Amino acid sequence: GTFLMSKLCIPHLLKSENPHILNLSPPLDMDPLWFQGSLAYTMAKFNMSMCVLGMAAEYSGKIAVNALWPRTAIRTAAVANVLGGQEMYDKSRKPEIMSDAAHIILNKDHKTFSGNFLIDDSLLAEHGETDFSKYADYPFDQLMPDFFVPADGYPVPKVVKES
């Protein structure tokens, strides 16, 4: 889906003033932990991430291609109804954290900001956000972590830990 949708949109994006493709996909991490018990889902998400790598190189300077991924679970119907019920939903962050992060990415210069794998709260902290409490009803240490966030490559910003 990601490849086909991008392929069909590229001719139109090339005519745009500041064209971007933003995939909601994780940083690539070959830790077997992410493959065990969820191989099909992992393959699907990492496929989207590989599209970021390939398309960012192929359209360098013409179309920005980046990936955004949440550090914690996000309040969606899937979380409430499929993954974890009301408790997991309540201990997830609000979708606004992703939209605020996406807004930052989509306003970057497409010629210079491409091929990045970004974690929502890290990006927001880098751009001056200090109040992460508005994105959740529980303290950070009680939130449900999301899948695919490598522990070593994307440390939690200090301002996030404190909120």
Predicted regions and their residues:
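Hydrophobic positions on the long internal alpha-helix
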Residues: G1, M5-C9, L13, C51-V52, ...
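Short alpha-helix in the Rossmann-fold core of NAD(P)-dependent oxidoreductases
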Residues: G1-T2, S6, A44-K45, D90-K94
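Conserved long hydrophobic alpha-helices within structured protein cores
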Residues: T2, H20-L24, G115
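Short, flexible micro-motifs
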Residues: L4, A57, L118
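Catalytic loop of short-chain dehydrogenase/reductase
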Residues: I10, L14-G61, W69-I74, A80-G85
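Conserved Rossmann-like nucleotide-binding pocket used by diverse enzymes
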Residues: A64
